[in-house]
């Protein structure tokens, strides 16, 4: 499908995961406006990279393993106003990290990672790769962030609430710490089903992460005012 935002267009026909609310919220929420360099892990169609380009003056490096998705991503970059600040790397993040040098540390890392750790794989192989952590485990993701993140940098992720216990267990044994969480609630009155996370290099002593909530929709089905404020620079309707 094709999606037109206020300042760019996305064609995600050959991508494992279609454009969805999770990525839009993450791209609008991440605190990356002051970043000079951004790394998008698992770029897919390039949505997060393009949102980062619109919101900052950063140079964005986008790493995507799947060749078909990488081709779609490159097409979307080429047709955007920020093609000169967007670099696509068709590679696994593990291979990319092996080549990184000190000068290439990133001020901000953004990622909407695969989220099913087990169970029936999606039938379509591209969709399976995009959705299941077999292609990028939490351990591999945290290792990559540790290697690529600048000393004072932050990483922004979105995860299912049901994955947080496992994620926090792995995080506790990493060199990173959780400094901020925002619980994402789909509709007024429901429990949070997604969590927006900010990670940084571990410091001592560690402090409890800041916590907040965002509710996406009113009971009427309309977006909440908080959500409208978050996405108004991107959605044509607003």
Swiss-Prot record:
Q: What is its EC number?
A: 2.1.1.223
Q: Name one GO molecular function term.
A: nucleic acid binding
- What keywords were assigned to this record? Cytoplasm, Methyltransferase, S-adenosyl-L-methionine, Transferase, tRNA processing
Q: Which InterPro entries match?
A: DNA_methylase_N6_adenine_CS, rRNA_Ade_Mease_Trfase_CS, SAM-dependent_MTases_sf, Small_mtfrase_dom, tRNA_Adenine-N(6)_MTase, tRNA_adenine-N6_MeTrfase
Q: Name one GO biological process term.
A: tRNA processing
Instruction: Tell me what reaction this enzyme catalyses.
Output: adenosine(37) in tRNA1(Val) + S-adenosyl-L-methionine = N(6)-methyladenosine(37) in tRNA1(Val) + S-adenosyl-L-homocysteine + H(+)
Q: Where in the cell is it found?
A: Cytoplasm
Report the Pfam families cross-referenced here.
MTS
> Which cellular component appears as one GO term in the record?
cytoplasm
SUPFAM superfamilies in the record: S-adenosyl-L-methionine-dependent methyltransferases (SSF53335)
Function of the protein:
Specifically methylates the adenine in position 37 of tRNA(1)(Val) (anticodon cmo5UAC).
Q: Give the protein family.
A: Belongs to the methyltransferase superfamily. tRNA (adenine-N(6)-)-methyltransferase family.
Fetch the HAMAP family from UniProt: tRNA_methyltr_YfiC
PANTHER family (alphabetical): TRNA1(VAL) (ADENINE(37)-N6)-METHYLTRANSFERASE
Q: What is this protein called?
A: tRNA1(Val) (adenine(37)-N6)-methyltransferase
């Amino acid at each position: 499908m094709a999606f037109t935002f206020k300042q760019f267009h996305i064609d995600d026909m050959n991508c494992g995961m279609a454009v969805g609310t999770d990525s839009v919220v993450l791209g609008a929420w991440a605190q990356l406006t002051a970043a000079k360099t951004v790394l998008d892990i698992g770029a897919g169609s390039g949505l997060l990279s393009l949102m980062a380009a619109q919101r900052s003056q950063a140079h964005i490096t986008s790493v995507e393993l799947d060749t078909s998705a990488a081709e779609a991503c490159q097409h979307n970059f080429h047709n955007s106003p920020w093609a000169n600040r967007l670099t696509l790397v068709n590679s696994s993040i593990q291979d990319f990290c092996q080549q990184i040098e000190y000068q290439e540390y990133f001020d901000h890392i953004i990622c909407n990672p695969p989220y099913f750790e087990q169970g029936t794989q999606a039938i379509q192989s591209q969709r399976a790769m995009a959705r299941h952590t077999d292609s990028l485990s939490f351990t591999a993701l945290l290792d990559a962030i540790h290697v690529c993140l600048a000393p004072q940098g932050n990483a922004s992720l979105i995860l299912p609430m049901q994955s947080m216990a496992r994620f926090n267990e792995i995080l506790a044994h990493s060199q990173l710490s959780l400094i901020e969480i925002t619980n994402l609630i789909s509709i007024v009155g429901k429990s949070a089903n997604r969590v927006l996370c900010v990670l940084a290099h571990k410091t001592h002593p560690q402090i409890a992460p800041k916590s907040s909530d965002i509710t996406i929709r009113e009971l009427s089905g309309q977006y909440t005012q908080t959500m409208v404020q978050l996405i108004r620079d991107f959605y044509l309707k607003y």
